[in-house]
């Protein structure tokens, strides 16, 4: 058995059942060359880890972004759980060093193959989940995925509210929304603009921002929320 103390330190987890972590590192190629090994490969744990990772991020996104719609939430989750993200995290904790690989797989640089790294990392998450439970697994994931989560935060602030509002108003009212700056204040280097979104003689909402574009975007966001809330209220009648 490999000494996995360094890996445990990287994960921030001391296993009650170290055999679970070892199991998570066993590739099918190693099992093929060691048929007497009783516990098999890490594939079943990979399945569980994938599910745990998905539900933890789904829960986080749902609570962090209450104003973002299902389609965007799905896109954000996909960014977080995609193979590239898993590989980056796996490389960051030097996971490939600990993999149990068959000789041929090892010679063919299997310790650096994205599929091997991503699968083993998901299996490691399953091992943590089984050994420590959901809360500890959540803490590990949020710490290791900090960079990916910061990227999602940035993306969430750049959602095209104006396009979504236009689609909604055109579909519901057969009107095209327009924007105008109605006021501004402050010195030239630090202006605060007020914009409103309207169609014909109807004003839907207003928003503010440090640029005209930001003010228009915020006006669209407010209007979109109002429209969506009104549709929800109608559905509940």
UniProtKB/Swiss-Prot annotation:
KW RNA-binding (keyword) present: yes
Record InterPro entries: dsRBD_dom (IPR014720), RNase_III (IPR011907), RNase_III_dom (IPR000999), RNase_III_sf (IPR036389)
The reaction(s) this protein catalyses: Endonucleolytic cleavage to 5'-phosphomonoester
Database matches in Pfam families: dsrm (PF00035), Ribonucleas_3_3 (PF14622)
Entry cofactors: Mg(2+)
Domain RNase III: 4-133
GO biological process: one example: rRNA processing
Active-site residues from the entry: 50, 122
Any one annotated GO CC term: cytoplasm
Residues annotated to bind Mg(2+): 46, 122
EC assignment: 3.1.26.3
Subcellular location: Cytoplasm
Keywords: Cytoplasm, Endonuclease, Hydrolase, Magnesium, Metal-binding, mRNA processing, Nuclease, RNA-binding, rRNA processing, rRNA-binding, tRNA processing
Summary of the function given for this chain in its UniProt record: Digests double-stranded RNA. Involved in the processing of primary rRNA transcript to yield the immediate precursors to the large and small rRNAs (23S and 16S). Processes some mRNAs, and tRNAs when they are encoded in the rRNA operon. Processes pre-crRNA and tracrRNA of type II CRISPR loci if present in the organism.
Similarity section: Belongs to the ribonuclease III family.
Subunit record text: Homodimer.
Protein name: Ribonuclease 3
Species in which this protein is naturally found: Dehalococcoides mccartyi (strain CBDB1)
Organism lineage string: Bacteria, Bacillati, Chloroflexota, Dehalococcoidia, Dehalococcoidales
